[in-house]
Amino acid sequence: MMNGIKSSPCNMPYLPDDLLLNILGRVSRLYYPILSLVSKRFRSLVGSLELYKIRTLLGRRTENCLYLSLRFSYGSNPRWFTLCRRPTRTPSPEPNLKSRWFTSCFRPILTNLTRATSKEEKKLSENLMVSIPTSNDCPLSGLTCNTIGSYIYMIGGYINGVLSSRVFFLDCRSHTWHEAPSMQVARKSPLVNVLDGKIYVVEGWRGSDYSNLIEIFDPKTQKWEHVPSPSAEMRGRYISKGLVYEEKLYLFGDKNVVYKPKESRWDALGFDMNLWLVSYGSSCVIDNVCYMVFYKRLIWYDSEVRYWRVLKGLEKLPKLRHRRSCIRMVDYGGKIAILWEKKVRVVGSDKKMIWCTEIALERRSAHKIYGKIEWCDVVLTVPKSCSLLEFIAVTI
């Protein structure tokens, strides 16, 4: 009430779904998590497959989206998050974190901690990891994922405490779980790689049945096929890492082998190639170059001389964790995306921060590659007990 005049809410004109979908189709998908908070109607439209048909008709290119899965307590199912961009609002010296734009999972760090920590933690992040609502749950308590197109496949794990061969995938357009054909063999925690549009599943644990070491799934035919295992002389007691590089599948362990799909052939590898170093850190391959985090530095593999070189130009990058369980890196549309954990530097705090950075790449000569930090933000704050599971890029 002002000067005796009763105020009334602003009457927004009702826009038909077709028009709203046309508008939403022109907006970057990075803003969809925020837009889904406007109303139930917006949430339904943002998660509809019709929206992506319209984006295609409008000539919108596919976008690369980052997804993160976390386990908040022992035995609980993973929770999924996706990267979104904070919308630009009216400038304010003290942004209101209680605004309806935000939920608790949007906040990169709690307000009372922000004032007590260092400058790097005081700035509100422009990029945030937000929890995604799924229309159904995945019954598989799995640990291993990989992506093809807009689908995240969860492979290997347990259902109600029983080891299962069932496979599920998340459609990242509608955030709905679906079931794919089951594997031929139940697997606990396999290595999963994508090569030539097919999913290669490798059991890496000691004592595995080597006759069923590997099988591949073709999403086009929806069929699983058996792949002959390497000979007893080639294979070792365990496999700790799989890597797709130069259109081949490399498997590293106490012995190293490479599978050449075009020839259906296995070859033994010596340690002189030096590519086996990827077993000791998080890695990704971009434009046929392998990158990895090794002892808090980013390095890349120079295949001409079989030598690892330091990625230059990243002097301002915060110190990275070396432990594989605390850091992940992926190919993010031709750039490197790195995600890592960092303690909140407040006495008695039971929180930790999750940082993320995007790094553009520039090859300046045959033996020199430079990186440029596009952005580096705290994207989420979680309890210390929370475990980092998967960090993957999806093309939508």
From Swiss-Prot:
PANTHER family: F-BOX/KELCH-REPEAT PROTEIN SKIP4, GALACTOSE OXIDASE_KELCH REPEAT SUPERFAMILY PROTEIN. The keyword Repeat applies. Kelch repeats lie at residues 151-197, 198-248, 250-296. This is Putative F-box/kelch-repeat protein At4g11770. InterPro entries: F-box-like_dom_sf, F-box/kelch-repeat_ARATH, F-box_dom, Kelch-typ_b-propeller, Kelch_1. It comes from Arabidopsis thaliana (Mouse-ear cress). Keywords: Kelch repeat, Repeat. SMART domains: FBOX, Kelch. Residues 9-55 form the F-box domain.
